[in-house]
Amino acid sequence: MIDSHELKRRDSYLNKLIGFQDTEPVKVITGIRRCGKSSLLKLMVQHLKDTGIQPEQIIEMNFESFDFRGMSADDIYHYVKERVVTGKRMYLFFDELQRIEAWEDAVNAFRVDLDCDIYVTGSNAYLLSSEYSTYLSGRCVEIKMLPLSFREFLDFHGFEVRETQSALGGLRKQVFDKNGERYELQEVFDAYMRFGGMPGIADVGLEQEKALSLLDGIYSTVVIRDILEREKRRGQKQITDPMLLRKIILFLADNIGSSVSIASIGNTLVNEGLLDDGKRKGAPSAHTVQAYVNALLESYFFYEIKRFDIKGKAYLRTLGKYYIVDIGLRNYLLGFRNRDSGHAIENVVYFELLRRGYDAAIGKIGNAEVDFIATTADEKMYIQVTESMMSEDVRKRELSPLQSIRDNYEKIVLSLEPGLDASYDGIKSENLIDWLLSE
């Protein structure tokens, strides 16, 4: 078991958990495997101990561990009941609870029978699917966890950003490691775009071979445990072809940020000869492809973003896009080469918006498109993402959709080369890396 003093803090998530401490809802932490959910539970346990909660009031169960293998919901209930300290509030931590059949029965029993505060993690959205959410309706709060942001990446890898003065007197940001070695900010951002934000990369270092090995382990675990095995446990027979699953994963990874329909996935795989293994005749049905894509969404491997008609003020049912949860996983799947970097930085912006609490949609305005409409309960902004704003043609292409939106919400173009102009008729032009580093 990892000691929590060795763990890097992820304050944005920990503070959310602390904010819900000792409230009735079950705290459910969701996200792809190995994005840091178990570590977050450890940090919360340490916080409880630091604030006076006695160790005997805390019960931790990790259902990936051999210690708790094969347990039923009844077994969990009795295990906890035997360890309850009379007259004290208990703090219950259940890691990867979706592996237990009828887990919700035990959780509900604890809520009824004990004075307790419950924390749960799960690597599959099935944990909170409609089938089970009826049991916890209104009684749970979901904390959605993602791999490291660029700021967290810097922290986890021991980098510090400092402003230094250039020979001409201007200020520029540079990065220093623990040994005082200096790097250009772009160089470290390139490493983030190469290796991604899985926390485990910080343990093995920024070396391609070690990173590939770690990412291979994550990929295999997600596919085998969270998709193929889960389907067997559910008694469903939809996800039965590991080869088709991998081909769909590769297709979606290669087409992040591109408009994709379910029909186009199957047709493309057939037309490009990607299913010519002698076993499958013709294109897989749309129903089959949808089932495989849903399984990938439920395992938090990919996220779907919908299109929103800005003038009609309605979501469109056709041609959404998919983004991959970690750019390092994409590079592991497709190869570590500079491919489609425009969509790759778009991918990074999408997940940064989610981290900051925004809902994101693609904006449709006439025949044009805005990369992201980002909204919260009281805020809205339109965002375009491009590699460079140095070319007149690119500026026109990126600014035109924003200029055609007739409202007063903030409009921003994020790029790695914003040029000299900080704004164009009220549309901000910002450096993407500076935006990622901002609060």
Where is each model-derived feature located?
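Conserved glycine(s) of the Walker
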Residues: 36
